[in-house]
């Protein structure tokens, strides 16, 4: 379908269409231009069919719209000389449509999906870094942004729309990408945004409380994640056997690679496996000895904490499953860099060690604090808040975790959005046994500054919740703010 025309694009579903050339594909009538294909989907907030007249006025070449029902699937109408094709269950078909439009980019690179509550960003970054060290031209897609390694452009969502995903992949292929590592969110799976992608491998990191404002309960959240393996072309399956959900899934995925730090591996049951034999944590990171069905080895890592060792082992197992030689992986492992805003360490002589992390769920906060404790000779500080207009149930849980695992807790704002900041803080304090010992400071800049200035040089200050983000949402305003930049400025170093 070299010239991208309407007849060839819809050939698997609809016959009798004109071979009208199409310039670009868009879901947004505001940016639709002459020669484009406008796709009018029925979304959660708006019905795209209402904007068909606007798209026609802007000169689009053709329109695909959601059909009223199964009976009208494939119906073709003409409005002001523009063909309008109606398809039933358009959202479910959108990934396949966009895949055809952009010439199936996922088939022209090695694309790895990474899903799970925590660890997606670090694991995708490690996969991209490591594969590039082995000669690939690697790209990432996810929370931090999309692009070739080192040229990432920030994005709004972990997983973009079905059209965005295929468009970005096509752009990456055009730039020469041969390997891609992509974060896949539960929203993205439920909303069919990656439905037609051909993954070479799919990685599951872990599952813990998050997004229950969207999914309702943990059962539905787990079901959303499981879709990657049950309804998608998942390729090689790599699963964290230390996670209870992961162990359950491994029973249904007999060909999966089981990965463990805690001994949850039975070589007689798991044909392919990788497990940590010994891990030594030190001020520079960790030394990891491992065994696997591919052979044994040792890695010096600059990453902090046990959960990052798990992320590293998942990345290693994935690349082994894809056929990269163990000897080459071991030779290049020491060159892997820490990930921006993910247990990122800032140090300066005579100042406390500051760690900036994206932890914004109960499980992630606990793991971040446990990781920081491994590298802390003095007091462990925790500065954090919770996002407004999001799952309120996790707030007291995170308060309890901070109180249990940190020596000094500073509760502040995260992204309060349209909620009253003090109300969010009170929800956090409600989970604590002795809230009177907690330091409360609403302004995040002031809270971070106060903690770093008061901490001693052998203390560790964990600033949790925002990680790589360079903004704060207050009300409906997006304000410039970065934990990384604030910490670096106070320590007199460069972020």
From Swiss-Prot:
Record carries keyword Cytoplasm: yes
Protein name as catalogued: UDP-N-acetylmuramoyl-L-alanyl-D-glutamate--2,6-diaminopimelate ligase
Pathway: Cell wall biogenesis; peptidoglycan biosynthesis
Lineage of origin: Bacteria, Pseudomonadati, Pseudomonadota, Gammaproteobacteria, Enterobacterales
TM spans (from-to): none
Organism of this sequence: Salmonella choleraesuis (strain SC-B67)
Nucleotide-binding listed as a keyword: yes
Gene Ontology biological process: cell division; cell wall organization; peptidoglycan biosynthetic process; regulation of cell shape
Gene name linked to the record: murE
Protein role: Catalyzes the addition of meso-diaminopimelic acid to the nucleotide precursor UDP-N-acetylmuramoyl-L-alanyl-D-glutamate (UMAG) in the biosynthesis of bacterial cell-wall peptidoglycan.
Keywords: ATP-binding, Cell cycle, Cell division, Cell shape, Cell wall biogenesis/degradation, Cytoplasm, Ligase, Magnesium, Nucleotide-binding, Peptidoglycan synthesis
Chain residues that bind ATP: 116-122
InterPro entries given in the database record: Mur-like_cat_sf (IPR036565), Mur_ligase_C (IPR004101), Mur_ligase_C_dom_sf (IPR036615), Mur_ligase_cen (IPR013221), Mur_ligase_N (IPR000713), MurE/MurF_N (IPR035911), UDP-N-AcMur-Glu-dNH2Pim_ligase (IPR005761)
Subcellular location: Cytoplasm
Meso-diaminopimelate recognition motif, short sequence motif: residues: 414-417
């Amino acid at each position: 379908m070299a010239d991208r025309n309407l007849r060839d694009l819809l050939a698997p579903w609809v016959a009798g269409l004109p071979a009208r050339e199409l310039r670009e594909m868009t879901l947004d009538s505001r940016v639709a231009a002459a020669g484009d294909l406008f796709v009018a989907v029925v979304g959660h907030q708006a019905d795209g069919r209402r904007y068909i007249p606007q798209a026609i006025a802007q000169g689009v070449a053709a329109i695909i719209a959601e059909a009223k029902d199964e009976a009208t699937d494939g119906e073709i109408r003409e409005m002001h000389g523009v063909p309008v094709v109606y398809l039933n269950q358009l959202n479910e078909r959108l990934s396949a449509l966009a895949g055809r439009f952009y010439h199936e980019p996922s088939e022209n690179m090695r694309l790895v999906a990474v899903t799970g509550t925590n660890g997606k960003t670090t694991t995708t970054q490690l996969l991209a870094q490591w594969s590039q060290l082995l000669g690939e031209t690697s790209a990432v897609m996810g929370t931090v942004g999309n692009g070739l390694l080192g040229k990432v452009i920030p994005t709004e969502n972990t997983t973009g729309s079905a059209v965005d995903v295929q468009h970005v992949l096509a752009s990456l292929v055009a730039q020469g990408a041969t390997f891609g590592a992509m974060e896949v969110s539960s929203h993205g799976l439920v909303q069919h945004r990656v439905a037609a992608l051909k993954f070479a491998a799919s990685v599951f990191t872990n599952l813990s409380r998050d997004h229950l404002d969207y999914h309702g309960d943990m059962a539905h959240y787990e079901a959303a994640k499981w879709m990657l393996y049950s309804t998608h072309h998942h390729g090689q399956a790599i699963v964290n056997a230390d996670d209870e959900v992961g162990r359950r899934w491994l029973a249904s995925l007999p060909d999966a690679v089981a990965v463990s730090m805690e001994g949850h591996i039975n070589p007689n049951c798991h044909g392919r496996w990788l497990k940590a034999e010994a891990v030594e944590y030190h001020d520079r990171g960790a030394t990891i000895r491992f065994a696997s069905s591919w052979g044994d080895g040792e890695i010096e890592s600059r990453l902090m904490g046990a959960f990052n060792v798990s992320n590293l082992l998942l990345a290693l197992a994935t690349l082994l499953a894809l056929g990269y030689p163990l000897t080459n992986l071991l030779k290049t492992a020491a060159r892997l860099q820490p990930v921006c805003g993910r247990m990122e360490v800032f140090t300066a002589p005579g100042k406390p060690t500051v760690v900036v992390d994206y932890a914004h769920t109960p499980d992630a906060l606990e793991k971040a604090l446990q990781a920081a404790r491994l590298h802390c000779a003095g007091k462990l500080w925790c500065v954090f808040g919770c996002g407004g207009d999001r799952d309120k149930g996790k707030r007291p849980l995170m308060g309890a975790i901070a109180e249990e695992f940190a020596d000094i807790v500073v509760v502040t704002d995260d992204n309060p959005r349209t909620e009253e900041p003090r109300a969010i803080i009170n929800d956090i304090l409600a989970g604590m046994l002795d809230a009177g010992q907690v330091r409360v400071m609403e302004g995040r800049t002031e809270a971070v500054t106060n903690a770093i200035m008061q901490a001693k040089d052998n203390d560790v200050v964990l600033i949790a919740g925002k990680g790589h983000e360079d903004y704060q949402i207050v009300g409906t305003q997006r304000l410039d703010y970065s934990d990384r930049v604030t910490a670096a400025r106070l320590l007199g170093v460069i972020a």
